[in-house]
From Swiss-Prot:
It is found in: Cell inner membrane. The keyword Transport applies. Belongs to the L-rhamnose transporter (TC 2.A.7.6) family. It holds the Pfam family RhaT. This is L-rhamnose-proton symporter. The chain crosses the membrane at residues 4-24, 38-58, 68-88, 101-121, 137-157, 175-195, 214-234, 259-279, 290-310, 321-341. Its main location: membrane.
Length: 344
């Protein structure tokens, strides 16, 4: 396995670790509605950071975006919006299925759809079937799915042991939302694929290869911001017990604390895709769709490890922890299989 591929896998791991930890600051926010908290964090992660970093990277910000016609930008934006819909469905999936089953189904579907649909759309799915490297990476995808399934089972055992139940368990509604979440969340993978002309244009301007994907986030995350912020603002305006005015009528120290914590959560959320771009840049071009598989499987891996570090599994007993450990090992094996496939 080459150093470039090893570093690509490593950066995807770092990005996934940030994704697994980003909600921790949000949990410390007090006396704010979820909608206000999510909006403040979202403004930082989907608007301020993509624009600020792109402005630093690009020699002429407006000239860069002005060179693309609508036929290039619109698919990137719409796939970003598609991914934004997946974000919203994610929370609803957890409500109706519970954390373990919801994450397992949603992540499993988005891993398959986001990874395998891209080569199908590009017309090079035969690379997966008819080359040794392609078959190895395909095997890695399915091993990763097995790992996700094992971690999901560990979560179910933990919830059963600790008496944790879904907020409003509804299997039919939850499964529908989980499938929708999995499909729509793959929009980020599709957006990155559609944004290749933007990446190439950034490279032509002399932007470091590690950073060439970052300017496209202005458009991708703009689509996600439209959906997420629109959803939050509509609820803040229409739901009677929600009020942004009330949220900002608290004591000033608490408001400042909530803003800073939400902004920190937004920063950590953005960093997952900052390092995703670094990892993506190191993956061989013919296997770039594997970035999504690495990100999502590492997200499950890191989520389990973070839970252990935070002692969320302390009272779960030995069996759930043993099953979780097995699932994490399987995901690590899957990443190595994919790495070897990309190197062959």
């Amino acid at each position: 396995m080459s150093n470039a591929i090893t570093m690509g896998i490593f950066w995807h791991l770092i990005g996934a670790a940030s994704a697994a930890c980003f909600y921790a600051p949000f949990k410390q926010v007090k006396q704010w509605s979820w909608e206000t908290m999510w909006s403040v964090g979202g403004i930082v992660s989907w608007l301020i950071l993509p624009w600020a970093i792109s402005a630093l990277l690009l020699p002429d910000f407006w000239a860069y975006y002005g060179q693309f016609n609508l036929s290039t930008l619109l698919p990137v934006f719409l796939f970003g919006a598609m991914w934004g819909i997946g974000n919203i469905n994610y929370g609803l999936t957890m409500r109706y299925l519970g954390m373990s089953m919801g994450i397992g189904i949603a992540i499993g579907i988005t891993l398959i759809v986001g990874t395998l649909m891209t080569p199908i759309i590009n017309g090079n799915f035969d690379v997966l079937i008819h080359t040794e490297g392609g078959r190895m990476t395909l095997l890695g995808v399915f091993v990763a799915l097995i790992g996700v399934g094992i971690v999901t089972r560990a979560g179910q055992l933990k919830e059963r042991k600790m008496g944790i139940k879904a907020e409003e368990f509804n299997l039919k509604k939850g499964l529908l939302l989980a499938v929708m979440c999995g499909i729509f969340s793959a929009g980020m993978s599709f957006a990155m694929n559609a944004a290749k002309p933007m990446h190439e244009a950034a490279a032509a301007l002399g932007v470091d290869p590690l950073y060439v994907a970052l300017p496209s986030y202005v458009v991708i995350m703009g689509g996600g911001a439209l959906v997420n912020l629109g959803f939050c603002f509509i609820r803040l305006a229409k739901v009677q017990n929600l009020s942004i005015k009330a949220d900002f009528s608290l004591a000033r120290p608490l408001i400042i604390s909530n803003i800073l914590l939400s902004a920190l959560g937004g920063l950590m959320w953005y960093l997952q895709f900052f390092f995703y771009a670094w990892g993506h840049a190191r993956i061989p071009a013919q296997y770039d769709y594997m970035s999504w598989m690495l990100h999502m499987s590492f997200y499950v891996l890191c989520g389990g490890l973070v839970g252990l570090v935070l002692k969320e599994w302390k009272n779960a007993g030995r069996r759930p922890v043993a099953v979780l450990s097995l699932g994490c090992v399987v995901i690590i094996i899957a990443a190595n299989i994919v790495g070897l496939g990309m190197a062959s």
